[in-house]
Amino acid sequence: MPQEHRANAILPCSDLDASQAFYERLGFALASDYGHYRILSDGSGWHLHLTQTSGGWLMPGHNPFGIYLYVEDVDAVADRVRELIIEPGAPHMKPWGTYEFAVSDPDGVLVRVGRSH
């Protein structure tokens, strides 16, 4: 059987516990724990790798990395993180045709959650 092609993000984290708790609210669960390196899964094929890092890699407000999570029930996910949503009143339709909202993870990574219409 051929190997499935996919890509996984590896996110540097200043606090693994805080990052894991944040992504669990977005629907991920711990799949593997190697101490300083954790793998989260959504149960449908997504994997997110979190790695403990020391300071110096992050400039607050200037993190150039982001993640887009496509989900069917955007509103259900938004309800789990309502107080963290960046734009008040979100989720909403964007001019480019997605229904989405955005949050920042504990290290300032932009996380957009949405679906195409």
Regions from the PLM with identified roles:
Residues 4, 35, 96-98:
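Loop/turn position at the start of each blade in beta-propeller repeats
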Residues 29-62, 110-115:
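Conserved short beta-strand elements that form part of the metal-binding/catalytic scaffold
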Residues 1-18, 65-67, 114-117:
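N-terminal beta-strand motif that seeds the catalytic metal site of vicinal oxygen chelate
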Residues 24-31, 85-86:
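Conserved acetyl-CoA-binding loop of GNAT-fold acetyltransferases
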Residues 14-17, 67-110:
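Vicinal oxygen chelate
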